[in-house]
Amino acid sequence: MDELKHQVMINQFVLTAGCAADQAKQLLQAAHWQFETALSAFFQETNIPYGHHHQMMCTPANTPATPPNFPDALTMFSRLKASESFNSSSSPSMATSPPPPPVSWGMAPPMANQQSLWTQGPSAQQTHPPPGWPSAVNQQAASEQKASAAMEAER
């Protein structure tokens, strides 16, 4: 049972610390299988051997978070101008936006016989809720219908 427990701890340590399984086993054994103690020892720089320390100091390559050579990137950005176009034709730049389309919705009131798409007209609504509902619900529904009819009349 202890062997299974140790294997689970090693796997958990590998997932947490991102180290190799043999290194995790060594650290856990040195910490008498105390997970937090071994994890603290792993993340302290004094416990990293010199050979591994050099690898940690190198800049990673080919990772999504690694930018290109920074001075070269700055030089490339400094050469860009806001008015430059990526193609050589005399067409306007992609940075300029076309004129907005004319807005037609919301400008004119709806016609008298036209119902709103979002609300149903008074004729389409139920006049009374189902008979099993409490009277308070029936009164609220009636007042909401009156308010809806009043709002439709104002339009």
From Swiss-Prot:
Transmembrane segments: none annotated. Residues 83-96, 139-155 have a biased composition (Low complexity). It holds the Pfam family UBA_8. Residues 81-155 are annotated as: Disordered. Residues 112-127 have a biased composition (Polar residues). PANTHER family: UBA-LIKE DOMAIN-CONTAINING PROTEIN 1, UBA-LIKE DOMAIN-CONTAINING PROTEIN 2. Belongs to the UBALD family. This is UBA-like domain-containing protein 1. The gene is ubald1.
